[in-house]
Amino acid sequence: MAGPQDASLEEILWRSPPHVQMMGGYLHSNNILFYFAESPFFDATSNNASLAIQANYNEAFRHFVETREAFEGRLRTMQGLEFVVAYDPLQAAAQTDTQFAHEPSNVWVIRKQMRRKRAGQEDEVVVLATFFVVGDCIYMAPSVASVVGNRILSAVTSLTSLLKTASTLPIFTPAHGHTYLPPAPKPADAGQPGVPSQQSKENTPMPDAENPARVPLVGSQAGNTASTFQDTRTLAESLHLFLRYEDEYMDENPLVGEPGSFIMSKANDVDRTATAKQPQSTIPTKMGAPLVRVDTPGKGPEKVGTPSSSDESSLKKKKGGVGG
């Protein structure tokens, strides 16, 4: 299991140009392990460090550090922690001793492994870590658990950000349920027969002109539009309910009077008040026939049709004129 120190080593890069200059100016097969020993990835308790110290103080071990083959051959006879070269680009590209089949990649692979000796059997080797040397830069290869963990963390972070953004979009209304955008009202004259469907061409946008109405509403714009629509809808419903139930009261004895002098009315008073408020009957009655006055003879002093004295004198004058 990788500890806290191993986790931090996966995030660093180490290089040392001065050590490269001290080792001849470039890295090759015989000095790559000694260059790696100067990095923080190296373990001072490994067999590599023990063999290098013995070669410095014992002439009998000096030849083990002259070539990498001899050095790794000596490590295979020891038991414990060791660092070996798993991939050598120079050997992989070499065709003969003096020619290369292709250009070397200059990428080295070094493994940290634990070797255990078993009697009569091959050694048991357990790989603990892998390192890459690219040019003079040394990296530690991440473990599979670290790679998978980082990918899962990245996916979870993206999903969390998505849910935070999407949580502000749904709108709930009793009429429409859960919606992400407010329903667009239908035009009033869209389905009416007889209404011309031709529209004015004055405001027709040109093909190369941007139409701001086609820009989608996102984020706060969609929220503001939905809030305005909901407020307008609530106001219309409230006005409709008021006009429908304005004469109904929840109390058995409603308040009557003017503001500042309200009194509790009784049920009988309410009935009388309601009866008084009812308009009088305005049902038209049948019109009778016109009255005709008929004069009948009676005892009155007045005589109907009696000529006056002036009329009699005028008649006499006419008769006299005719006779003469």
Curated annotation (Swiss-Prot):
Gene3D superfamilies: Mediator complex, subunit Med6 (3.10.450.580). The keyword Transcription regulation applies. It is found in: Nucleus. GO terms for molecular function: transcription coactivator activity. InterPro entries: Mediator_Med6 (IPR007018), Mediator_Med6_fun (IPR016612), Mediator_Med6_sf (IPR038566). Pfam families: Med6 (PF04934). Residues 221-230, 275-284 have a biased composition (Polar residues). Coiled coil: none annotated. Its main location: nucleus. Residues 178-230, 271-324 are annotated as: Disordered. Component of the Mediator complex, a coactivator involved in the regulated transcription of nearly all RNA polymerase II-dependent genes. Mediator functions as a bridge to convey information from gene-specific regulatory proteins to the basal RNA polymerase II transcription machinery. Mediator is recruited to promoters by direct interactions with regulatory proteins and serves as a scaffold for the assembly of a functional preinitiation complex with RNA polymerase II and the general transcription factors. Component of the Mediator complex. PANTHER family: MED-6-RELATED. This is Mediator of RNA polymerase II transcription subunit 6. It comes from Aspergillus fumigatus (strain ATCC MYA-4609 / CBS 101355 / FGSC A1100 / Af293). The gene is med6.
